[in-house]
A protein has these predicted regions:
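Catalytic nucleophile-loop/oxyanion-hole region of alpha/beta-hydrolase
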Residues: 90-91, 97, 115-147, 260-267
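Short amphipathic alpha-helix adjacent to the substrate-entry channel of hydrolases
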Residues: 91-110, 234-235
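C-terminal catalytic histidine-bearing segment of alpha/beta-hydrolase fold enzymes
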Residues: 238-287
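N-terminal cap/lid segment of alpha/beta-hydrolase-fold proteins
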Residues: 23-72
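Short beta-strand/loop motif that positions the catalytic acidic residue
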Residues: 216-219
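Primarily recognizes the serine-hydrolase "nucleophile elbow" in alpha/beta-hydrolase
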Residues: 131-212
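Active-site glycine-rich loops that stabilize anionic/oxyanionic intermediates
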Residues: 82-87, 221-222
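Conserved alpha/beta-hydrolase "acid-adjacent" motif
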Residues: 224-231
């Protein structure tokens, strides 16, 4: 009996240590501004609200970093902006899950938490959201060497309202300020390519420039809100002679995420179409 009493606590301690060691390490989170967003520094420590798949009350914009497995990084990076109507952030299904998928392809992925200007009681505006995505692009480009990223292969992926966020940087010059004291602000905020999944209409320009970032565009024809955006943006890219690949599925509605919860086989398999596009553009190949 005495021996048993000695062994049981030791066994319990061993199991606790083993369990802790087996738990995956949480991905690192990087605040976009060290002291908080400009003009709202005093709010940076306010706790976020979240439950299941959504986040709200975001006052300290950040990037959650998803690194490829050791030895698999190919030099490409993507910043992922989830949707949620600018009222909430569908962070897990449209931020974390696609970032993990991209990391499995050797792409260094960053899930963005940006400020929500339509959240009830919000003091933010669309300009603040634009500040967040521009700062995110500049942060990744300025620190590209740290993550073994090619600064000429940094893209943006936007879902629904996150597609509107992506448009805020895709169709503007975004050049850095060479005289800025902050080295991050010297980097360009313009993405080298973009991936838009059922994007909203906000931020889509009246005319797409010929040098617009190459675009992978995807959604469903029975998505009443988004279908007109898909056709309109495809037409504008075609008229400009800019590079675009469009996938419009007959059925799927809105918010099918990575497809695994859809009853439609074509929607379930849509990430394969994205992978093929990335491969065709040699964005999954190490340079």
């Amino acid at each position: 009996m005495p021996t048993t009493r000695v062994l049981l606590p030791a066994l319990f301690l061993f199991l606790c240590i083993a369990s802790r060691a087996a738990q995956p390490t949480a991905p690192p989170v990087i605040a976009l501004w060290e002291h908080g967003a400009p003009g709202f520094e005093t709010r940076r420590n306010e706790p976020e609200q979240h439950q299941d798949w959504w986040y709200k009350n975001i006052h300290n914009p950040s990037l959650t970093v998803f690194l490829p497995a050791e030895g698999k990084a190919n030099g490409t990076a993507v910043i992922v902006a989830a949707g949620g109507g600018h009222r909430e952030l569908v962070f897990n299904p449209e931020g974390v899950e696609p970032a993990q998928y991209l990391a499995s392809l050797g792409i260094t992925a960053f899930a963005l938490k940006y400020r929500l200007f339509r959240e009830p009681g919000s003091k933010y505006t669309l300009d603040n959201t634009a500040e967040d995505i521009r700062r995110a692009m500049r942060t990744v480009r300025a620190r590209a060497a740290e993550w073994h990223i090619d600064p000429r292969r940094i893209g943006v992926m936007g879902w629904s309202a996150g597609g509107e966020v992506a448009a805020l940087v895709a169709y503007s010059p975004g050049g850095g300020d060479s005289k800025a004291q902050d080295p991050v602000e010297r980097a360009s905020a313009r993405p080298d390519f973009q991936i838009l999944i059922y994007p909203g209409p906000l931020g889509i320009p009246a005319r797409v420039p010929r040098d617009a970032p190459p675009l992978f565009l995807l959604g469903a024809a029975d998505d009443e809100y988004v279908a007109p955006v898909l056709f309109d943006l495809s037409r504008k890219y075609h008229e400009a002679g800019a590079s675009i690949e469009t996938h419009i599925y007959a059925q799927g509605k809105h918010g099918f995420n990575m497809g695994q919860r859809s009853k439609y086989v074509s929607i379930q398999r849509w990430p394969h179409r994205l992978t093929e596009w990335l491969e065709d553009r040699e964005l999954t190949r190490a340079h």
